[in-house]
């Protein structure tokens, strides 16, 4: 193993999942999103759908490194039941079957940006639940391509910026503020 970072991250995620499971009596799902690119979508699918039997969801996007716009994740979180199917020899089930229909909450912090800014912005826009934590860092711009330089390097500069339905630039240099501000100060609490 070249680095233990991945193992430590996985241990942190699993500790959080077990804590949410224990404190909620098995009623809440815990889903951590490391980014809004491939690994983030993999994490979402792995954790969200495996916990479909839960009554609510804690989405943790702290330290989200961004990637792409997270509309897929928000759309999945926002799925509403459209009816039931009755089984001849079993209990009825919701349609669509994949999803957690109960309350949702998202944990955010100042180390989430770009797609990690877009995700809580969309979550709040759709009124999926409260945002808890600290304001995201406010870096919602994007790049398209990396023009090469003569020495074989590359240059990146923002080529996309986000604005809202009022026609105003939004989120960039502002971030997304929580509904409930909670500072994570484990050292101050003697829990480092």
Where do the protein language model's features map onto the residues?
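A residue-level detector for conformationally permissive "hinge/kink" positions
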Residues: 79, 125, 144, 159-160, ...
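Metal-dependent DNA phosphodiester-chemistry modules and their immediately adjacent helices/loops
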Residues: 18-19, 114, 151-181
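Cleft-lining beta-strand/loop regions that shape enzyme active-site pockets
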Residues: 1-153, 187-192
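Active-site/binding-pocket entry motifs
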Residues: 37, 83, 162-163, 182
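Extracellular low-complexity, Gly/Ser/Thr-rich intrinsically disordered linkers
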Residues: 179, 183-184, 191
């Amino acid at each position: 193993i070249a680095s233990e970072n991945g193992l430590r991250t996985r241990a942190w995620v699993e500790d959080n999942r077990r804590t949410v499971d224990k404190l909620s009596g098995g009623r809440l799902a815990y889903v951590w999103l490391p980014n809004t690119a491939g690994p983030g979508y993999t994490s979402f699918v792995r954790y969200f759908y495996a916990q479909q039997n839960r009554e609510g969801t804690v989405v943790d996007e702290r330290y989200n490194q961004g990637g792409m716009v997270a509309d897929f994740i928000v759309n999945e979180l926002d799925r509403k039941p459209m009816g039931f199917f009755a089984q001849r020899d079993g209990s009825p089930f919701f349609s669509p079957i994949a999803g957690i229909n109960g309350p949702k909450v998202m944990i955010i912090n100042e180390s989430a940006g770009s797609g990690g800014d877009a995700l809580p912005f969309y979550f709040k826009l759709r009124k999926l639940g409260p945002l808890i934590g600290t304001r995201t860092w406010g870096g919602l711009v994007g790049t398209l391509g990396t023009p090469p330089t003569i020495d074989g390097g590359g240059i990146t500069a923002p080529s996309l910026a986000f604005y809202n339905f009022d026609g105003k630039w939004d989120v960039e240099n502002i971030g997304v503020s929580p509904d409930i501000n909670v500072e994570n100060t484990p050292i101050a609490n003697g829990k480092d």
